[in-house]
Swiss-Prot record:
It comes from the Archaea. The keyword Zinc applies. Belongs to the eukaryotic ribosomal protein eS31 family. Its cofactor is Zn(2+). This is Small ribosomal subunit protein eS31. Zn(2+) binds at residues 31, 34, 49, 52. It comes from Methanococcus maripaludis (strain C7 / ATCC BAA-1331). One of its GO terms (cellular component) is ribonucleoprotein complex. Binds 1 zinc ion per subunit. NCBIfam families: PRK00432.1.
């Protein structure tokens, strides 16, 4: 028989928000395809959505300043 799989752990969504007084600020970028409830992962040179696979590349600041 195959080994039993453990329970999946979920991320704490409260870590993705910053609350100051009555204002709430999102700390991570939201996916434009999935909507406001899905956050994108930030990698070295891109943002990626784990749900739909949408990817946005960051602009390279060095090449823009050299031109």
């Amino acid at each position: 028989m195959a080994a039993k799989k453990g329970a999946k752990t979920t991320t704490k969504k409260s870590d993705y928000y910053k609350v100051e007084g009555n204002a709430v600020e999102r700390l991570k970028k939201a996916c434009p395809k999935c909507g406001a409830g899905v956050f994108m992962a930030e990698h070295l040179n891109r943002f990626a959505c784990g749900k739909c696979g949408y990817m946005e590349y960051k602009k390279n600041e060095k090449t823009e300043s050299e031109e």
